[in-house]
Amino acid sequence: MTRSDLRVGMVGLGAIGLPMAVNLRRAGLGLKVHTRSRTTEQHPDLEGSQACSSAAEAGRDVDVLILCVSDDAAVDSVLFGRQGAAASLPNGSVVLDCSTIAPSTAVAAAERLRRQGVSYIDAPVTGGTEGARAGTLTVLAGGDAEALERVRPLLEIIGGAVHHFGAVGRGQQVKAVNQVLVAGSYAAVAEAMALGTRLGLPMQEVVAALSSGAAGSWALRNRADGMLAGRYPLGFRLSLHHKDLGIALKEADSVQLTLPISNLVQQQEAELIGRGHGDEDVSALHRLFDSIS
């Protein structure tokens, strides 16, 4: 089956899901779309897609149903809740779940779907809104290899790299590792920008110089300037990263491992959420230094 033959549904049209859906449409795929808020189904870049009133409608008569929703409860709701997709998915179809959820939630969903002849792949992505728009997301997949090959043509539209880590749940575990790295790198850049500013250094030159050295990172290259200007354009929502760190910390607990940096960053994010900054980018961690920098 060629990619143009695939019948595809998509549930979740948020900051990451919407540009993913737009890229699928631009690639010529017929697409059924649903989002729980119903606000973006008629987006002009989705012209030609079929807007669906429920996840069940989006999953009816499709070969692949893509999910990109906010958390474990949302995945459970759109699959198994009232008007959930599981009731309408055809035997032999594949659920491609690009949400970031607990590995145990992914495993449980896969088992429930398996009983009705539906395959499930956990395929969280990394790369933020920039990667979603450009179609260069990194896909971290867990699940049956044959099912993964069936959906690979879609993954190659939304992602620049597709990595398979084994059984269902492994993709989510790798995403947990990714979010630990994001926590440390963003927090370090925020601290470094605060220190350099307090010392009176020419920070644009500092960032340019350090970006090509051993301290260079994606966060430094792409978020330092915004931090210095007090601007935090949305790449990945701070509140969602806080949720993801909770998943990572639970995974660490399960193997008797303490993650002190991630614990601290999660506490800092909780403070910022309490101040009303949860919908800003993770780089808003720099706000913790506003009063001293």
Residue ranges and their predicted role:
Residues M1-L67, S93, C98, T129:
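NAD(P)+-binding Rossmann beta1-loop-alpha1 motif at the extreme N-terminus of oxidoreductases
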Residues L31, A51, Y120-I121, V162, ...:
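Hydrophobic beta-strand scaffold residues
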Residues R38, A55-R60, V64-L65, D71-L137:
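Rossmann-like NAD(P)(H) cofactor-binding subdomain of soluble oxidoreductases
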Residues T100-V180:
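Rossmann-fold dinucleotide-binding core
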Residues A134-G142, A167-L199, L210-N222, L240-K243:
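Active-site-proximal catalytic alpha-helix in oxidoreductases
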Residues Q172, L181, G216-D281, S293:
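Interdomain hinge/lid region at the active-site interface
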